[in-house]
Amino acid sequence: MAGQVVQYGRHRKRRNYARISEVLELPNLIEIQTKSYEWFLREGLIEMFRDISPIEDFTGNLSLEFVDYRLGEPKYDLEESKNRDATYAAPLRVKVRLIIKETGEVKEQEVFMGDFPLMTDTGTFVINGAERVIVSQLVRSPSVYFNEKIDKNGRENYDATIIPNRGAWLEYETDAKDVVYVRIDRTRKLPLTVLLRALGFSSDQEIVDLLGDNEYLRNTLEKDGTENTEQALLEIYERLRPGEPPTVENAKSLLYSRFFDPKRYDLASVGRYKTNKKLHLKHRLFNQKLAEPIVNTETGEIVVEEGTVLDRRKIDEIMDVLESNANSEVFELHGSVIDEPVEIQSIKVYVPNDDEGRTTTVIGNAFPDSEVKCITPADIIASMSYFFNLLSGIGYTDDIDHLGNRRLRSVGELLQNQFRIGLSRMERVVRERMSIQDTESITPQQLINIRPVIASIKEFFGSSQLSQFMDQANPLAELTHKRRLSALGPGGLTRERAQMEVRDVHYSHYGRMCPIETPEGPNIGLINSLSSYARVNEFGFIETPYRKVDLDTHAITDQIDYLTADEEDSYVVAQANSKLDENGRFMDDEVVCRFRGNNTVMAKEKMDYMDVSPKQVVSAATACIPFLENDDSNRALMGANMQRQAVPLMNPEAPFVGTGMEHVAARDSGAAITAKHRGRVEHVESNEILVRRLVEENGVEHEGELDRYPLAKFKRSNSGTCYNQRPIVAVGDVVEYNEILADGPSMELGEMALGRNVVVGFMTWDGYNYEDAVIMSERLVKDDVYTSIHIEEYESEARDTKLGPEEITRDIPNVSESALKNLDDRGIVYIGAEVKDGDILVGKVTPKGVTELTAEERLLHAIFGEKAREVRDTSLRVPHGAGGIVLDVKVFNREEGDDTLSPGVNQLVRVYIVQKRKIHVGDKMCGRHGNKGVISKIVPEEDMPYLPDGRPIDIMLNPLGVPSRMNIGQVLELHLGMAAKNLGIHVASPVFDGANDDDVWSTIEEAGMARDGKTVLYDGRTGEPFDNRISVGVMYMLKLAHMVDDKLHARSTGPYSLVTQQPLGGKAQFGGQRFGEMEVWALEAYGAAYTLQEILTYKSDDTVGRVKTYEAIVKGENISRPSVPESFRVLMKELQSLGLDVKVMDEQDNEIEMTDVDDDDVVERKVDLQQNDAPETQKEVTD
């Protein structure tokens, strides 16, 4: 027997065909959300307050500091927040200190700074009652970037950019005459040496001594018209502020504020890290020949002789000396923007491949401290040096799509940036108030205006492109949404501008971003998913784990290192399926491996690392596809995406053929209920589970507190599906930490169960499965195999209007008693009532305009004391196709103190209607391999083809759907599924390490089936066997959210567009079917003139004609001739608005006045039937 039995959770065993043992547990799949938010609460907020403190007034007398903060208890708990449409948030209170320097007085106060949304345990936020997810954003990391480009003459050129987190960009470029220019903040370019002079290197000689003599520098100095620091400063000022009178002082302060002021310019810690890494001498001296010795500055000894070529080993040896500033120089700069001395490291090397033995200087930035978030003069000089080195052939250009140059902004950082915006707006207000208020009586509370802070947080959660309504169709959709990475959003790319290169799969995505799971359509490649083992480091770079290889013994160790994409570039990584002996050494002398994106074969001694698992390449959703290795990538993409659209079924069933990921995905998705502590189950009910904690002290276990786990029962999910949790533990069970206690929707026994295992045959049947259509047995309808429950929410508000308040009541004008049968005395539908389309759910009347009463009404009013009420019926009715059973009714009243109602609303009623939807013709189904189709026919069970033992099969699929799509995985799943069913087992075939052909065939033989997996089928209608044997097996098929009930739509009359008077389009607007240009051509080709005329007039925008037609049909009269369509008038007005004189003439060249053809005077054509009924003799008569 191939494979070994593995336990998944408490209740499920699977036969696992994996050959590679798991060395690392999968991490918690939603920690990308939870960890980032924890960081924000722990450090991010404090960092913000520290950055802004102290706020001083213009005289420097008052100083406001933010000392500390705390979060209070939320006003409503999670459930209550959802019910009340409130935000799940806690009050943020900040301790503020105000210092008055004149008197030395210190005032401290705790100031309320608004309610701050809290993250739930499952990584979501509840905003206005709806669960939302903040998607992580992929952006370009702040750093120094060097690019290669070809100019119009075909010459190779370079440009460089220093990109900060916020602040001015600095760019270097060369022109056709080999002059190097600099651009400050996208303005006009200046010779590079002007910026150097402004930094304090005044004379030409100083600049040449600094950067080393080369042709580019000489050309630039010739072009440079300035001669000293002052002239250079004035020159820069004129470029940045044209038209203003330049002075040296103004120029200094301008340059200072652009680059050296921490409030205006911020590299952030990640920018400092990347800049130091890029400009560090270690990477730049690699494989270079020294033109001078490297000297330890502290001891004065020579570490490396002149003429040495530095390989990687040599550089590692001298690393300490390089970091202790070997060959460093300190420059005292006078008259510059910054008066502090500048320290750099410079080492001369020989220009590669140069016969004349020329040298160039490699300058490093002397490694500024990580606390220095601004750019330093040393950074600018070192980046210029790198640029000149590139021109000499030393150094590397950067690939912007490499994940070493792209980083993630997760929830915490996105929130922090938003909070910073709010605080900086508040800072302005505080400064203004400081100058107005009286210093004696002033308090921190009076200075601080929290509105801008609250507004910026609300704006972020409510309307940011990255704050999204959670996709809650099933647990996998939930999980994937929380792990999504988007390159769109503020500060990111736009769909239109994103090039092919950005969207493409890059070698650095390996183990970090899934190469398969991405949407089809305009967002392809811009929205990605995090790989299964990946995690995000403190700088926001994605890391993936590798097993370390011992450099001496060349054996795999237990040490696991997480590497970022640029760290990985230095190492050779072996694949996870490399053969190892029992000591962890590679068995083959030549090992398949990766190095910088090249898949090659190298000697086993060269290996540095090895992959942790074959599934580290793909995301959680893709890892749920068995036999992924046998599917074409395009179909695998569809399979991964369609699993997220599977509707939770009433009776879910885990797949016979899984991958082992189902349990992990279900546990981490947030849809299941997991134990927060180890304990013993004391009580189980359908709506709650009680667990007594088991605590171990001094080796003795004793009982602790009681944990209560409430279960959600038949709630509506964000996608309108049924969210229901069911206990899977029994009283007395001892449960471990993080064990599943209750299944959520689409789960069975602690595993994800998106569909059902059904018996499928690959065969045609009277052409009903043409074009991927699916033929299904009626058994699946009768036995509720694919029945799903859907819950829709409808609400009705009673508002205050100008004419008086609206009223929710049972007393509705012109409505029969039978229409009110489901309403209670308040006018609200009963729970449990069965309602059909058009039934009243909430009776509501709205006051109409008050009219003058007639004499009779006045008399009645005098006798009975009541006026006939002038109200119109505005009741909430069941929309088309939404009938069902009323599940729940919620009523909110302003009188009862419901402060969550929006202004002007007195009463709000919410009605939940539940539908049980059986599977229909027209519903969409799919497998896990991108094999999708629409149900074309539901065949009675007795007519379905049946197996030799008399069992009818469930589904017939078209065999032509397999070869051209190249998703052979579905065929292997089919065979292995049948074997698993016959053996009564569940199997796991992990991606890239699953069952191979031999395993599948041997399992089939073990199950007593034919070796080719085919069988004789008999036609259910005739009882005759089919000519050929047919592949029959068990496939896991899902019902997708594209259901025909939601798409079916019909209209007779309905709303019309205001300008063109044509019917609206789409089901949501109750629109019509568009009869477009091509359809008109089709009718013209047939010569169907009258059909065409009525489609273009009565049925569309002939406003008068359609009313007359409706009238004629109701009265049984003949339909009158059409008048002018409204869109023709619109066209005329359009042309007239362009200044053209447009008139409509009849055959006698008399102008037809279009304005006359109005609703009041309709042109009617009357036929004198006595004369002749030919159309030519019809006369035009205007009534």
UniProtKB/Swiss-Prot annotation:
Q: Which GO terms describe its biological process?
A: DNA-templated transcription
Q: Sorted alphabetically, which CDD domains does this protein's record hold?
A: RNA_pol_B_RPB2
The EC category is: transferase
**Upper taxonomic classification of the species?**
Bacteria, Bacillati, Bacillota, Bacilli, Bacillales
Q: Which UniProt keywords apply?
A: DNA-directed RNA polymerase, Nucleotidyltransferase, Transcription, Transferase
User: Which reaction does this enzyme catalyse, per its entry?
Assistant: RNA(n) + a ribonucleoside 5'-triphosphate = RNA(n+1) + diphosphate
Q: Which gene encodes it?
A: rpoB
Self-association and partners: The RNAP catalytic core consists of 2 alpha, 1 beta, 1 beta' and 1 omega subunit. When a sigma factor is associated with the core the holoenzyme is formed, which can initiate transcription.
| Keyword flag Nuclease | no
| Gene Ontology CC terms, in alphabetical order | DNA-directed RNA polymerase complex
Pfam hit, one: RNA_pol_Rpb2_7
Q: What is the originating organism of this protein? A: Staphylococcus aureus (strain NCTC 8325 / PS 47)
Concerning PANTHER family, the annotation shows: DNA-DIRECTED RNA POLYMERASE I SUBUNIT 2
Give the family from UniProt: Belongs to the RNA polymerase beta chain family.
Its annotated function is as follows: DNA-dependent RNA polymerase catalyzes the transcription of DNA into RNA using the four ribonucleoside triphosphates as substrates.
Q: Name one GO molecular function term.
A: DNA binding
The record's section on PROSITE patterns has:
RNA_POL_BETA
The Enzyme Commission number assigned here is 2.7.7.6
The protein's name in its UniProt record:
DNA-directed RNA polymerase subunit beta
